[in-house]
UniProtKB/Swiss-Prot annotation:
Keyword RNA-binding: no
EC category name: transferase
Domain of life of the organism encoding this protein: Eukaryota
Purpose of the protein: Responsible for the formation of the pyrimidine heterocycle in the thiamine biosynthesis pathway. Catalyzes the formation of hydroxymethylpyrimidine phosphate (HMP-P) from histidine and pyridoxal phosphate (PLP). The protein uses PLP and the active site histidine to form HMP-P, generating an inactive enzyme. The enzyme can only undergo a single turnover, which suggests it is a suicide enzyme.
Gene for this chain: THI5
Protein name: 4-amino-5-hydroxymethyl-2-methylpyrimidine phosphate synthase THI5
Similarity comment: family membership: Belongs to the NMT1/THI5 family.
The keyword Metal-binding is annotated on this UniProt entry: yes
Positions of the catalytic residues: 66
Length: 340
């Protein structure tokens, strides 16, 4: 049975959007496929692509921009599927901090970022808006961006809408302030990207492992698809099962984050070709990818039909923003139905 083992590294400690992975384990979906899974948590999220690329771990999770950069830096990894599609990502701040929708209001402020690519993104934006990197103070926060904003260690920081923004909203609610006082300058809008796909969370593989174990990867993805279908069909029941296994997530904050992640879960798991093209171009613009870089993703290990891509991605993003705001106000589980 040792040959059926897969080591899988999360992109951080267990979060609400890791639910398909853990339910595939607890509900026996991996076992049905003859797989013995070892699900690991990183000490440092910045090490994930290096550990997978060096072959110390077989598979794991990472955002699209990091997956692209990893291979460019000599860590051979490939995305084989999507977990969380295009979560809104941007510079988070609180109303009353002196920051406005004008990017130049960040001048003289302390801005937090998760890892080095966040710093590169902000530096590129400062040039675009007539500023210099010296016009702000960069603070590396890891995954503690919301915490640092709350504690006053930074004025703003890069985060995603369904995670760090919800954390800020919960803090505001406890202070008797409206949740809408948590604001975001979306990077896709600031950088004229047309999508938030650079932070799409992906299932990635070590290239050598993928080459030697194609059937094992197919089986893994079948189990993940079954778990994802289960989550999307009955999110409340799925959550109860998840927190029974991960009781540290049994709190209001995690549940609200889960509600906001719900619309972002990829139902098909397919890598979106248009998104990869855009983010590869963005990576070249940021100079983290060489001009001749070829995107490192594949859909060949997914054994069900590929859905059509949305015809108008900008309209889809606009509708998603409205949808997520409604979800925040109503606290419900809803998927966005896009017009044909």
């Amino acid at each position: 049975m040792s040959t059926d083992k897969i080591t899988f590294l999360l992109n951080w400690q267990p979060t609400p959007y890791h639910i398909p992975i853990f339910l595939a384990q607890t509900k026996g979906y991996f076992k049905e496929q003859g797989l013995d899974m070892a699900i690991l948590e990183p000490t440092n999220p910045s090490d994930v692509t290096e550990l997978i690329g060096s072959g110390k771990v077989d598979m794991g999770l990472k955002a699209m921009i990091h997956t692209l950069a990893a291979k460019a830096r000599g860590f051979p990894v490939t995305s084989v599927a999507s977990l969380l599609d295009e979560p809104f990502t941007g510079v988070l701040y609180l109303k009353g901090s002196g920051i406005t929708e004008d990017f130049q209001s960040l001048k003289g402020k302390k801005i937090g970022y998760v890892g080095e690519f966040g710093k590169i993104q902000i530096d590129e934006l400062t040039k675009h808006y007539g500023m210099k990197p010296e016009d702000y103070t960069a603070v590396r926060c890891g995954m503690n961006v919301a915490k640092y904003i709350i504690e006053g260690k930074i004025d703003a920081g890069i985060g995603i809408e369904c995670m760090q923004q919800v954390e800020l909203e919960e803090y505001l609610a406890k202070q008797g302030r409206p949740a809408s006082d948590a604001k975001m300058l979306r990077i896709d809008k600031l950088a004229c990207l047309g999508c938030c796909c650079f932070c799409t969370v992906l299932y990635i593989c070590n290239d050598e492992f993928l080459k030697k174990n194609p059937e094992k990867v197919r089986k893994f993805l079948k189990a993940i698809k079954k778990a994802t279908d289960y989550v999307l069909a009955d999110p409340v029941k799925a959550w109860k099962e998840y927190i029974d296994f991960k009781p540290q997530l049994n709190n209001d904050l995690s549940y609200k984050q889960y509600q906001r992640c719900y619309a972002y879960f990829s139902s098909s798991l397919y890598n979106v070709h248009r998104d990869w093209k855009k983010v590869t171009g963005y990576g070249k613009r940021l100079a983290i990818l060489p001009p001749d870089y070829v995107s490192n993703y594949t859909n060949e290990y997914l054994s069900w039909p590929e859905p059509e891509e949305v015809s108008d991605p900008l309209e889809a993003q606009r509708l998603m923003a409205i949808h997520q705001e409604k979800c925040r106000q109503e606290g419900t589980f809803k998927r966005l139905a896009l017009p044909a």
